[in-house]
Curated annotation (Swiss-Prot):
Its main location: membrane. One of its GO terms (molecular function) is proton-transporting ATP synthase activity, rotational mechanism. Keywords: ATP synthesis, Cell inner membrane, Cell membrane, CF(1), Hydrogen ion transport, Ion transport, Membrane, Transport. Produces ATP from ADP in the presence of a proton gradient across the membrane. Gene3D superfamilies: ATP synthase delta/epsilon subunit, C-terminal domain, F0F1 ATP synthase delta/epsilon subunit, N-terminal. Belongs to the ATPase epsilon chain family. This is ATP synthase epsilon chain. It is a peripheral membrane protein. F-type ATPases have 2 components, CF(1) - the catalytic core - and CF(0) - the membrane proton channel. CF(1) has five subunits: alpha(3), beta(3), gamma(1), delta(1), epsilon(1). CF(0) has three main subunits: a, b and c. GO terms for cellular component: plasma membrane; proton-transporting ATP synthase complex. The lineage of its organism: Bacteria, Pseudomonadati, Pseudomonadota, Gammaproteobacteria, Enterobacterales. It comes from the Bacteria.
Amino acid sequence: MAMTYHLDVVSAEQQMFSGLVEKIQVTGSEGELGIYPGHAPLLTAIKPGMIRIVKQHGHEEFIYLSGGILEVQPGTVTVLADTAIRGQDLDEARALEAKRKAEEHIKSSHGDVDYAQASAELAKAIAKLRVIELTKKAM
């Protein structure tokens, strides 16, 4: 039997996941993080993107996170997300439209602030599309 730890993924709206997992993958402020059982204690910001959850027995779940905080303690990991949406609940058409609008905004941006905001929106749309794609593959 694989080693596991307890994971809680919570957004401002609801608890998205609570259970035993073998590992997770998430994008922290310093890059990609893989959290396995026995990981050293850690507190870090999460960038917009996805969390890949490998549950007990190897089943995978993908959740889009708009950002938040990751806390790793012995035996338990907590993700406090600004917004969290399960892959199957994301709307592909809306994500594609958001991506298109962000790309247009980047092309027509005037100034660093406009460009930075449009780039952030583009990154969020691309992350949502990636979560949708991986969720479809996992089903």
